[in-house]
């Protein structure tokens, strides 16, 4: 999803809450990001900071470093800082439920970004349609390589809605076009891991024709 559009959507949902803009002016919102080692999430952070500033908010950004325990500690910390809204990009769609439960108990409105949460009360979820995106990628490969192409898949972080949905969407296309799935392994949305996993898979599947990576960082690796 375009980060400018995402920032606008985030602000729109915040503004539709029960607290008015004027009442919240100069108050602090919080953004908890799964990792800032991924350029996508840096762009997300930058867009959120720009929109928060334009609306007169302070934005506190915390990095969970792809660690659910760090994510939980971040949210626990935020509940005593007096922030008004929590924007969270989950490290794991199941594990984040513990962090959201703490925010819910503190009556802190929660919005999830890019990755959904399987538990807890969330005001809104803002993301692209990852199932549709995965299917589009598979259909595109079919236009270039035809039916029954030999494919390898680089998966994202297990447990995230983005990895699950992109994989599910790609499978729809793979089944429709009778792809031969030679291998599919996780590389955790990481460039270096993408390189290492791809090298290992290529050593056993030299006849591969195409690769589907569930994010751009793995593809660049």
What are the functions of these language-model segments?
Residues 5-7, 15, 23-221:
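A residue-level marker of the well-folded mature domains of exported/periplasmic proteins
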Residues 1-3:
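N-terminal secretory signal peptides that target proteins for export/translocation
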């Amino acid at each position: 999803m375009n980060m400018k559009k995402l920032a606008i959507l985030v602000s729109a949902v915040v503004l539709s809450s029960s607290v008015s803009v004027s009442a919240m002016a100069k108050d602090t919102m919080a953004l908890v990001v799964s990792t800032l080692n991924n350029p996508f999430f840096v762009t997300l952070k930058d867009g959120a900071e720009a929109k928060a500033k334009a609306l007169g908010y302070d934005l506190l950004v915390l990095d969970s470093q792809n660690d659910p325990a760090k994510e939980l500690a971040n949210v626990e910390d935020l509940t005593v800082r007096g922030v008004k809204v929590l924007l969270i990009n989950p490290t794991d769609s199941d594990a984040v439920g513990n962090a959201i439960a703490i925010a819910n108990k503190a009556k802190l409105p929660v919005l999830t970004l890019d990755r959904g949460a399987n538990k807890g009360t969330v005001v809104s979820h803002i993301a692209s349609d990852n199932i549709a995106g995965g299917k589009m990628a598979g259909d595109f490969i079919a236009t270039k390589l035809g039916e029954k192409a030999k494919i390898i898949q680089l998966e994202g972080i297990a447990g995230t809605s983005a990895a699950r949905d992109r994989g599910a969407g790609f499978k729809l296309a793979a089944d429709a076009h009778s792809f031969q799935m030679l291998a599919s392994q996780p590389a955790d949305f990481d460039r270096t891991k993408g390189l290492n996993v791809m090298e290992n898979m290529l050593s056993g599947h030299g006849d591969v024709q195409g690769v589907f990576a569930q994010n751009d960082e793995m593809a660049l690796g």
